[in-house]
Amino acid sequence: AKTENKTVTVRQTASPIXXXK
């Protein structure tokens, strides 16, 4: 489940970076 957790963290981090694409 470590890989899934990392994917979720990256997705949440990319969300603000994208700025709401």
UniProtKB/Swiss-Prot annotation:
Stretch list, region Disordered: 1-21
Top-rank taxon, per record: Bacteria
GO CC field: ribonucleoprotein complex; ribosome
Residue spans of biased composition, Polar residues class: 1-15
Keyword Ribosomal protein on entry: yes
Keywords: Ribonucleoprotein, Ribosomal protein
Subunit structure, as described in the record: Part of the 50S ribosomal subunit.
UniProt family annotation: Belongs to the universal ribosomal protein uL30 family.
UniProt protein name: Large ribosomal subunit protein uL30
Gene designation: rpmD
